[in-house]
From Swiss-Prot:
Record-listed ATP binding positions: 29-36, 150-153, 187-190
Record family assignment: In the N-terminal section; belongs to the pantothenate synthetase family. In the C-terminal section; belongs to the cytidylate kinase family. Type 1 subfamily.
GO MF, any single term: ATP binding
Organism: Prochlorococcus marinus (strain MIT 9301)
Record-linked InterPro entries: Cytidylate_kin, Cytidylate_kinase_dom, P-loop_NTPase, Pantoate_ligase, Pantoate_ligase/cytidylate_kin, Pantoate_ligase_C, Rossmann-like_a/b/a_fold
Gene giving rise to this polypeptide: panC/cmk
Pantoate--beta-alanine ligase as annotated region, ranges: 1-276
Positions of beta-alanine binding: Q61
Name of the molecule in the record: Bifunctional pantoate ligase/cytidylate kinase
Subcellular location: Cytoplasm
Purpose: Catalyzes the condensation of pantoate with beta-alanine in an ATP-dependent reaction via a pantoyl-adenylate intermediate. Catalyzes the transfer of a phosphate group from ATP to either CMP or dCMP to form CDP or dCDP and ADP, respectively.
Active-site positions on this chain: H36 (proton donor)
Length: 510
């Protein structure tokens, strides 16, 4: 594709009609640095869409006229950087193109107060209104499939996500982690204004935030006043330093696994922001649902794509059921059940095909536990109080450090009630029966007619939903996904999009 520079809104409309491709859009205000390069290269590597970079210094988002006048302009270098790193086209409009005079169709938007009244919004009145206005205008002109933004401006990212939802815009927001320079400070177009001494001061500010992150991981409290005192001792002017919930921007709660520590300082005439995410453990995805809803298949793929541990809790109950049958244990007699729980060892191990095998006392039972014989008894065994207490404790041990996706029937309600993302995966009984019928790993199901399979699934649903301990129910904060008519890949992509929307990319950086 021929690389082009577009300067007029009419040209952007003609170009969009002629490219015969979806668009990845990377909006910038110019003076591009390695952070922008990361955005452009990420867009290029994500898919085969056409990549469009815009360069437009938006006056509406400047609350300080001097700041606008001093904003660095390096247009020739920006063009070179954009094209050499994957841009197919560059849009460089004038103010009149974006905000044509006497055009009543231009909407000047207000940012939501619940997100814009804290942090930067306290002192930069109207800033986020200007951001919303220009991005909304650009999105309507360009109509991209994906919008690429950096997490450095986290508050702005939240506000633009809200804008997309509020205006029902058909665009997916893709974010990348804050990119830092050699001395730890976040890359910013304004860094060119810093003297050597000012840069040292900002580096100290960033290092204090990163140190707070380490302290938090050690399960220690963050002392904001102490950090502010340290900064003040260095003659650093602190505009704000807040510990907040990462999505609501309200005060962080003790039970929040992921929280935001954000600050703004001034060095000379330059104002800079920085933040870190504080995390007690890595994120957890909890996937619940009835038998045959596709939980195992979907969860395995999600674990692989997100590099998370796959915890098949249902397999643990099946493994115990297998041992009870094998040893002819009368599980209704408490003492005999306690003996088998005391001696059992259930663990998972990757095999040569990169799949996960289930072991009971060092014996691989991956295939055996999927038999109809096990299916007919596992619900009864899993409803026993002692069994659930034992296996839930084992599952929580595995999940102490997070970094996993677990599937079962009580993951989001009982095992991991504070999971960052809870999914309730389900499907119609007809659909689930068909899946069981044609499951290559279940020979027993292949030999049973569809009607009988439906009746067995109904029976299992009733038992799971009506057991006294940890019944199968949808967690209050779970997102229900009905999988009828969707491919496995579509369901997996949907859940990964939800995960990416909730979990900052920066939390993946150790």
């Amino acid at each position: 594709m021929k690389k082009v520079i577009i300067r007029k809104t009419e040209e952007i409309e003609n170009w969009r009609r002629n490219i015969n491709s979806e668009i990845n859009f990377i909006p910038t205000m110019g003076n591009l640095h390695d952070g922008h390069i990361k955005l452009i290269s990420t867009a290029k590597n994500d898919n085969s869409n056409v990549n469009l970079v815009s360069i437009f210094i938006n006056p509406l988002q400047f609350d300080n006229k001097l700041d606008l006048e001093n904003y660095p302009q390096t247009i020739d270098n920006d063009i070179k950087i954009s094209f050499s790193n994957g841009a197919d086209a560059i849009f460089i409009p004038s103010y009149e193109d974006i905000y044509p005079p006497n055009n009543k169709n231009i909407k000047f938007l207000k940012a939501p107060k619940e997100l814009s009244s804290a942090l930067c919004g306290l002192n930069r009145i109207g800033h986020f209104d200007g951001v919303c206005t220009v991005v909304y205008r650009l999105l309507n002109l360009i109509k991209p499939k994906n919008l690429y933004l950096g997490e450095k401006d986290w508050q702005q990212l939240l506000i633009l996500k809200n804008l997309v939802l509020r205006k029902n815009l058909n665009v997916a927001i893709r974010s990348i982690p804050t990119q830092r320079d050699f001395d730890g400070i976040p890359l910013s177009s304004r860094n060119v204004h810093l003297s050597k001494n000012e840069r040292k001061l900002i580096s100290f500010f960033s290092s204090e935030l990163l140190e707070a992150k380490k302290i938090f991981q050690q399960d220690k409290k963050i002392n904001l006043n102490q950090i502010i005192k340290k900064l003040s001792a260095k003659k650093i002017s602190v505009e704000y330093l807040e510990h907040l919930h990462p999505h609501t921007l309200q005060k962080a709660r003790p039970e929040d696994n992921i929280s935001l520590l954000a600050g703004a300082i001034r060095c000379g005439e330059t104002r800079l922001i920085d933040h870190v995410f504080l995390m007690k453990r890595r994120p957890i995805i909890a996937i619940d649902g009835p038998a045959g809803s596709g939980k195992s298949t979907v969860t395995k793929l999600i674990a692989k794509k997100l590099n998370l541990l796959y915890l098949d809790t249902g397999a643990m109950y099946r493994a115990l059921s297998w041992l009870i049958i094998k040893e002819s244990v009368d599980y209704k007699i408490e003492k005999k059940l306690q003996n088998i729980l005391k001696d059992i060892s259930i663990f998972f191990k990757s095999n040569t095909n990169s799949h996960q095998d289930v072991y009971v006392n060092n014996y691989c039972v991956t295939k055996e536990i999927r038999s109809q014989k096990i299916s007919s008894i596992v619900s009864k065994i899993s409803s026993i109080k002692e069994v659930r207490k034992f296996l839930v404790a084992e599952q929580r041990k595995i999940g102490e450090s997070g970094g996993l996706v677990a599937e079962g029937r009580d993951i989001g309600t009982t095992v991991f009630p504070h999971a960052e993302l809870k999914i309730f995966l389900t499907a119609s009984i007809d659909e689930r029966a068909k899946r069981r019928k044609y499951d290559k790993n279940s020979k027993d199901s292949q030999e049973i007619d569809l009607y009988t399979l439906k009746e067995l699934i109904k029976k299992r649903d009733f038992e799971d939903s009506n057991r006294e301990i940890s019944p199968l129910i949808k967690a209050n904060d779970a997102i229900e996904i009905i999988t009828d008519g969707y491919t496995i890949d579509e369901v997996v992509d949907k859940i990964i999009d939800l995960y990416n929307d909730r979990i900052p990319k920066e939390t993946e950086i150790k």
